[in-house]
Structure formats: C-alpha cells, structure tokens
C-alpha cells in the first residue's frame, strides 16, 4: 500500500511539474509586425566575407548580365531575410506544444518549427525556409535552422552550409528602448506594450569568417487580418499580354 501511494504521489508530482512547465512557456502567438533592428535597416544586407564567398557571388552575377530583383518574379527570399524585412508585412504565430508555425504575408511563406525533440532529417530536401527545430530554455525559444537551398542573389546570400540560430523572447517597449527603423510602424502609438525580440546568428564557412548577427524587434498587433500577397498574378497578366499583343 505504501509503495502504491508513493508511486501515485510520484506520478502526480511529475504531471504537475509538466503542466506547470507548459504553463510557464511564454505565449508568443498572435500577429506581429517588425519595426526595428540592430544594426539598423542598412545592416539588413549581409555581404560575403570570405574570398571564396565573394568569388561565388561575383561569378553568379557575371553569368546573369540581365539580372533583376528576384522579388520581381515572385521568388520568395527565404531565411533569414524573410524575417528581417521591415516593410510592415505581418507574421502570424500559431503556438502549440509540439510545433510553432509562422505564417508570413510576405510572399505567403510558411515556417514550421518542430518542438517535439526530433533531429534534422537526413532525407529532407533543402528549401528556401529550411528545416527548423526548437526548444524552450526558460522563457527563451531557441531555434536552429538548416537544410537551406543555395541562394546567392539574396540580401543575405546563403549556401547549403548556412546555419541559422535564433533566440526569441518576449519583452516590452520600456525594456528595449529602440526606435523605429522600418518603413511603416505604429510604434509612435503602439496597440500593445508587447515586443517580440528575435536574435539571429548566421554562420556559413563558405561565405563568412565569423557569425553574422542581427536583432529584430516585432510589435504585437490586434488586427489579425492578412492581405493576399498575390504576386504571380501581375506576371501572369504580363505574360498574357505578351502572348496576345
């Protein structure tokens, strides 16, 4: 009887601790808009530092003399730049115990951060947003992203060896004391006092001699309505006009 009671108490304590830990996780769900960065907006462009990286980018652009901005062809930038833009495209965060999903109005991109302890799969194809796994360290969400496609015409160029580390945590305007560096922002009259801080560290032995770091600041919004980022429609209409002059 004593052993059974001890077992019940042990299970109860374990369950209570697990529930408490889950309850202590910060609620980062909702709609957020970037309003500032450190370094500032100019710092959102990252040039290769290694001789090999510079040569790779120069060779790429020499091959495509009539280079245009990829965004003009609705090519999504992917990570990390998709999270660094300050053109006031909102992101919506959906938070569950085993997964955090980030929906972006910008190019309608989707990030999935797996929180169930899994490892990066060996047979997963590289993508523009990569493969992200995360865990809570106290009140900080720590995310690692790999399996990224090579993209040399990006504001933050990357190769398949690029790794991105993120530390994400809730804060307030008073604690951060940052000014708006974005194009559009409601920081002058914020709808809430919540600030979501993203600290990024990007490494790539082919491109950089040291980690490239940038911190982004997002403010919580009350309006959860997204507009449709229907980028391909314009290109389709232009193609129809060209085919039927």
List PLM regions with ranges:
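Positively charged n-region of N-terminal signal peptides that target proteins for export
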Residues: 1-5
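Hydrophobic small-molecule pocket/channel-lining residues, especially in calycin-type beta-barrels
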Residues: 21-245
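Bacterial N-terminal signal peptides
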Residues: 6-17
């Amino acid at each position: 009887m004593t052993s059974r009671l001890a077992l019940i108490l042990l299970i109860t304590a374990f369950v209570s601790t697990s529930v408490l830990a889950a309850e202590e996780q910060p609620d980062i769900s909702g709609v957020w808009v970037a309003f500032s960065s450190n370094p500032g907006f100019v710092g959102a462009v990252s040039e290769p530092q290694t001789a090999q990286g510079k040569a790779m980018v120069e060779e790429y652009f020499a091959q495509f003399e009539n280079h245009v901005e990829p965004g003009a062809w609705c090519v999504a930038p992917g990570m990390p730049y998709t999270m660094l833009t300050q053109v006031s495209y909102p992101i919506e965060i959906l938070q569950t115990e085993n997964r955090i999903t980030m929906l972006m109005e910008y190019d309608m991109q989707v990030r999935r951060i797996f929180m169930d302890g899994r490892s990066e799969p060996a047979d997963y194809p590289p993508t523009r947003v990569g493969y992200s796994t995360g865990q809570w360290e106290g009140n900080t969400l720590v995310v690692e992203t790999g399996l990224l496609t090579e993209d040399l015409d990006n504001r933050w160029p990357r190769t398949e060896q690029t790794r991105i580390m993120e530390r994400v945590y809730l804060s307030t305007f008073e604690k951060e004391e940052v000014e708006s560096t974005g194009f559009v922002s409601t920081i002058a009259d914020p709808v809430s006092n919540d600030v979501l801080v993203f600290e990024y560290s990007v490494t790539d032995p082919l491109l950089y001699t040291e980690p490239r770091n940038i911190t982004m600041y997002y403010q919580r919004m009350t309006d959860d309505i997204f507009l449709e980022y229907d980028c391909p429609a314009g290109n389709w209409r232009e193609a129809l006009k060209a085919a039927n002059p």
